[in-house]
Amino acid sequence: MSKEPTAAAGLQNRFRTHYCGLLNRDSEGAGVKLGGWVHRIRDHGGLIFIDLRDHTGICQLVIQPESGELFRIAEGLHSESVISAEGSVVLRSDETVNPRLASGAIEVVVSAIKIESAAHPLPFPVADYMPTSEELRLKYRFLDLRRERLHENIIFRSQLTAAVRKYLTDLDFIEIQTPILTSSSPEGARDFLVPSRLHPGKFYALPQAPQQFKQLLMVSGFPRYFQIAPCFRDEDARADRSPGEFYQVDIEMSFVEQDDLFVILEGMFKHLVETMTTKRIAQYPFPRISYKDVMNRYGSDKPDLRIPIEIQDVTELFVNSGFKVFASNTKEGCCVKAMVLKGMGNESRLFYDKAEKRARELGSAGLAYIQFKEEAPKGPVVKFLKEEEMAALKEQLGIETGDVVFFGAGKWEQTCKIMGGMRNYFADVFPLDRDELSFCWIVDFPMFEYNEEDKKIDFSHNPFSMPQGEMEALEQHSPLDILAYQYDIVCNGIELSSGAIRNHRPDIMYKAFEIAGYPHDEVDARFGHMIEAFKHGAPPHGGIAPGLDRLVMILRDEQNIREVIAFPMNQSAQDLMMAAPSEVTAQQLKELHIKVELPEEEA
């Protein structure tokens, strides 16, 4: 919660001279005016107690029966009505002190009270927590935002945003706003399109990110840029992704290398964690893991490093195995992976059946495992393995009696992802420390990948990243062996941001697009404005853009991103409170030269 002076500095008027949650023993004897919401009201045998709430907290008002008209007004109050009250601060008796409230040592004896706004019956309680459907919470978001946890989340978000601004401006970053109405880009997610009235048949797009603008700012000579940037993407919702719009801490720097950006971001996150939370960072500086290594060891490019399980490669152990399922996957491009769960080898059959079901959901044909029981190893693949293979497994994996080892075999990428999915599935077995923040950088992403569907080389991630080795790499190396200066920052299994050192040279850009099958004229048609700018002197530059919503979500221990956004949409990208999206009038459509053709309803 924000810390403000007890007196309402600069706001002393007929409504308020003090804040409820900031009154304390030092306020004894003070005459105060308070304004807020009726949190609770209790009638204790002639005395009426009102818990009055403002954004700083709660204080108790006392109305005595001899108050006459005041008592009558208080008797008619309902929860969440807005009142203003005047009175004197007195100390509570020792036995009535409420240690759960910051103002619990005092109460205000009321001498005047006024109902500013009477509340109708509530669709759900604000003062007392009661499970409430998300639909109802979003429809009455103005009530939901009064609830303590959500209210504190929004205040925390404001404080975090202010701290980010101060940290970056202290490092000589310049905050610059970029356009909200811009041109549509065919790359990435779907755009939100805005029709132009003045240019019939043409459309603006809301920016998916200020990517091109911030790079152009580097070309314009601004060395360090940032913006708390709104971004708009027409994509489906997830627990950690809000549909429609989100905010990111957009950062770009010129004349930098990858390590320079890492130092800035690590310092900022460390500062935010240490000054705004009681959490601790597991390792600082943050560990850096190559894409290939992170897939081999964790089966995901956004690993939760708190999970005490690591995937190991056992391909070499089965090159000459009689177990064909493993032996057939020791060839180039395939692998055999293993994962040990310490002390979990004596679980019930149901445990393994559920695990196999999850593996099939992830795309596996099944789930091979061996339980290393005290009497003898047990499991569906034991009979296929030789004694020396079992011994080699135990030695390489450090297996002890009571452990269980799970296997995956097949094409490298698919097998890694399935094993990574199982690693996350088994995470529930282990108590994870919610106060530990395991940040890491994922680096050395491949520049290109082979598109199986189109049977061609394509960009694996950002086509505007600088290839490691620059032009020499593009001309002399196989495309699938080229790495890019691309990086992700991950915390506790959540990707906070992607970033890159940009490709600022038109010759390298043309060559990279040529490898991916794009001729010069197509590159010029799509990105001519960027290339034109780069032809007029572009400095080396790079950037990153951590998601503000996700960062608040992690630091506040929330499982759903809608718990850190004031007015979010639902899973179907609808604003239930404002009834958006909505139909518009025929006149509005006519002015925009638009005709709506709705899809035919299925029979």
Swiss-Prot record:
Gene Ontology molecular functions: aspartate-tRNA ligase activity; aspartate-tRNA(Asn) ligase activity; ATP binding; nucleic acid binding
Entry-linked SUPFAM superfamilies: Class II aaRS and biotin synthetases, GAD domain-like, Nucleic acid-binding proteins
Binding site for ATP: R233, D234, E235, E495, G547, L548, D549, R550
Binding site for L-aspartate: E187, R233, H461, R502
UniProt-annotated site: Important for tRNA non-discrimination, residues: H44
Record Pfam families: GAD, tRNA-synt_2, tRNA_anti-codon
GO annotation (BP), single: aspartyl-tRNA aminoacylation
Region feature (Aspartate): 211-214
Function, as annotated: Aspartyl-tRNA synthetase with relaxed tRNA specificity since it is able to aspartylate not only its cognate tRNA(Asp) but also tRNA(Asn). Reaction proceeds in two steps: L-aspartate is first activated by ATP to form Asp-AMP and then transferred to the acceptor end of tRNA(Asp/Asn).
Family according to the record: Belongs to the class-II aminoacyl-tRNA synthetase family. Type 1 subfamily.
Subunit-level organization: Homodimer.
The protein, known as: Aspartate--tRNA(Asp/Asn) ligase
Source organism (scientific name): Chlorobaculum parvum (strain DSM 263 / NCIMB 8327)
